[in-house]
């Protein structure tokens, strides 16, 4: 399946990749429609980031077309779309020893399960590899707070897809993100070389970033600002 087709398929989850609404109706209707869209968007984000995931280890996969990998996992047929830089990283016909962080995007009539990115070479170490400080703040309202504690990562390398997913799931479970707390907010993942990643909590991580790989020991800290 081509990238565009898979992207269209995910629209069934709701307006998941944008928090904006373009409208030319009168202001009263516009406000009502915006509220409705935001509520639907928030519920879709909650469903996505609390859905079923699988951490598939030591996978053997075959290249399928220009930008896909295919393999079987416990009898399930899996197809991984390779976004962004992954297209150039995976040029061989076959691969051994891959780890895949699976989040289902689609299931077709042939019982093939589709996911995007989340592929790295098999991690060889076990236990905690990195523990950057996770600073979380909510600055406004009666429930304002500031907290900081180590965030344990048990992989030498981790995709931005997996880190984004697990951070949001942590925020959902511990702080009510997308439930009692607004979906507005940002996450900044700072690396020791001065570079960083910004995540917008109002929208799902874009497909093109789901293949980004981060050396976990190079993560300096993670800042979360909730609104």
Swiss-Prot record:
Signal peptide: 1-30
SUPFAM superfamilies reported for this sequence: Bacterial enterotoxins, Superantigen toxins, C-terminal domain
Main location: secreted
Pfam annotation, one family: Stap_Strp_tox_C
Keywords from the named record: Secreted, Signal, Virulence
UniProt cross-references to InterPro entries, sorted A to Z: Enterotoxin (IPR008992), SSL_OB (IPR015282), Staph/Strept_toxin_CS (IPR006126), Staph_exotoxin (IPR008375), SuperAg_toxin_C (IPR016091), Superantigen_bac (IPR013307), Toxin_b-grasp_Staph/Strep (IPR006123)
GO cellular component: extracellular region
Tagged with keyword Signal: yes
UniProt keyword Mitochondrion present: no
Cellular localisation: Secreted
Family classification: Belongs to the staphylococcal/streptococcal toxin family.
Subunit field text: Interacts with prothrombin/F2 and coagulation factor X/F12. Interacts with human CXCR4.
Function description: Plays a role in the inhibition of host complement activation via the classical pathway by interacting with the Fc region of human IgG and thereby interfering with the IgG/C1q interaction. Also inhibits the penultimate step of plasma clotting by interacting with prothrombin/F2 and coagulation factor X/F12. Does not affect the protease activity of thrombin but interferes with the conversion of prothrombin to thrombin. Interacts with human receptor CXCR4 and specifically inhibits CXCL12-induced calcium mobilization and cell migration.
NCBIfam families according to UniProt: PRK13038.1
Protein name in the entry: Staphylococcal superantigen-like 10
Species, as recorded: Staphylococcus aureus (strain NCTC 8325 / PS 47)
């Amino acid at each position: 399946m081509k990238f565009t087709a898979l992207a269209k398929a995910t629209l069934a989850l709701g307006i998941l990749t944008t928090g904006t609404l373009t409208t030319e109706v009168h202001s009263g209707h516009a406000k009502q429609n915006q509220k409705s869209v935001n509520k639907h968007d928030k519920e879709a984000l909650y469903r996505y980031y609390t859905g079923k995931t699988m951490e598939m280890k030591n996978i053997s996969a075959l290249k399928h077309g220009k930008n896909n990998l295919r393999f079987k996992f416990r009898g399930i047929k899996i197809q991984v779309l390779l976004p962004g830089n992954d297209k150039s990283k995976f040029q061989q016909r076959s691969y051994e020893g891959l780890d895949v962080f699976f989040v289902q995007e689609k299931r077709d009539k042939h019982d093939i399960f589709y996911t995007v990115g989340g592929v790295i070479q098999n991690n060889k170490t076990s236990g905690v590899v990195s523990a950057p400080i996770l600073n979380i703040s909510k600055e406004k309202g009666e429930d304002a707070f500031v907290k900081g504690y180590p965030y344990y990562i048990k992989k030498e390398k981790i995709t931005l897809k997996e880190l984004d997913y697990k951070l949001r799931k942590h925020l959902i479970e511990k702080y009510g993100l997308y439930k009692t707390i607004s979906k507005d907010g940002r996450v900044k993942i700072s690396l020791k070389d001065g570079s960083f990643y910004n995540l917008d909590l109002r929208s799902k991580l874009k497909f093109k970033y789901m293949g980004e790989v981060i050396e976990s020991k190079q993560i300096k800290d993670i800042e979360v600002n909730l609104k």
